[in-house]
Amino acid sequence: KQVTQFNEGILPWAIQNPVALVFDEYDAGRPDVMFVIQRVLEADGNFTLLDKNKVIKQNKFFRLFATSNTVGLGDTTGLYHGTQQINQGQMDRWNIVTTLNYLSLDKEMEIILSKNKNLNNQKSKEKVANMIKVASLTRKGFMAGDISTVMSPRTVLHWVENTEIFKDTGYAFRVTFLNKCDEIEKNTIAEYYQRCFGEELPESLLNIQI
């Protein structure tokens, strides 16, 4: 004998339990779909299951979090294609909004070394520190409007891993990040590299013959 049984989804289940539910990439959700959490965002918001004629009361320890690359206004930079503009009525219901900026050099170094134990020596630490400094310059350059591509901590980690593969820091930088950049910005980014490592890349103006 076969029996069809209804099981509640992740949201109804989480609401009834002492759970911290995180919506990752929240701004990638379609606004008409995200309306389902509108009532949940109220201080004592309950969740209604219309197909079961059931109202679910929130557990007093239930918490809802969300992460996004935008602040609900849509993609104003062109870097996060696929994100949506979030309904402002829903944005108004989030009682705390905070910004997570890039990590400090020491924290970023700690993460990279934790994933690459063999680099835990003085020489390797100096090299990784210079890599993070290059990334920091791209972030400042992006904020200043000088370049349109930025190095994330993930990119730095890939650069470190590729350096281990190719045994060449400059080449690894080019295939990890520089080749993704706009052609007219490559000289600026090559300059960032030169400032930190004291070496010229082929993309540097000094190596371009007119």
Please state what every model-predicted region is.
Residues 1-210:
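C-terminal regulatory/interaction module of P-loop NTP-utilizing enzymes
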